[in-house]
């Protein structure tokens, strides 16, 4: 027997807790469930210009449309499938990962709505998650009606920045995370972007990045938390709780904006 993670009580599905655990269930005859993944929402992974092979997968993983938060593997879709198969086994089903297959006209049995866009952006900024940044870069292209290629993602991002009045002279956007050595931003373009983000009256759709806790707060949250060695010394403590900024860290490069 096993204890399921959820159960039905008084007509409602509730979580199993220590105080009110769901009743044990004795599984019936073993049933095998084949798990396939369809990650065709993005093209097969390639590297953009300036993206060093040594970065994969520990700095940033190959960009696929499926993955698990915090998982740095060469095949994030396979990792997601394995995770789901394991979850099925915890519910008494013999889930086995069978690789990729197009969903085609398969019947939809269930669906799940993940984090909202603002939640994804907040998470990406707080922990400096390169993988989420790259997925958002691809999704920007799709939102503009383009195929999710590197070139189209760059094109879509440049279109949006131009609409926001951000100067793009002497800038280069090769990747969404900034990992590419060919990414270039000027002080003018960066400060203009930050001004737009902080201007909630004229750009309410961007306000959550600054006012909604998106950008880390000095000495308080995310990659600027004092436990990470940020703003915890006598010369810097004065900015704790007052400054919002974004870190940028590679093997030999450290930035703060």
Label for each model-derived stretch:
Residues 1-70:
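Periplasmic/cell-envelope proteins involved in peptidoglycan metabolism and beta-lactam response
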Residues 4-16, 26-30, 69-209:
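A small/polar active-site loop signature that marks catalytic segments
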Residues 14-16, 44-47, 103, 151, ...:
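A short linear-motif detector with a strong N-terminal bias
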Residues 28-30, 59-61, 166, 236, ...:
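A generic structural signal for short, non-catalytic loop/turn and secondary-structure boundary residues
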Residues 52-53, 159, 245-246:
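Intrinsically disordered, low-complexity segments enriched in polar/charged residues with Gly/Pro
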Residues 175-176, 181-257:
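C-terminal soluble interaction/assembly domains
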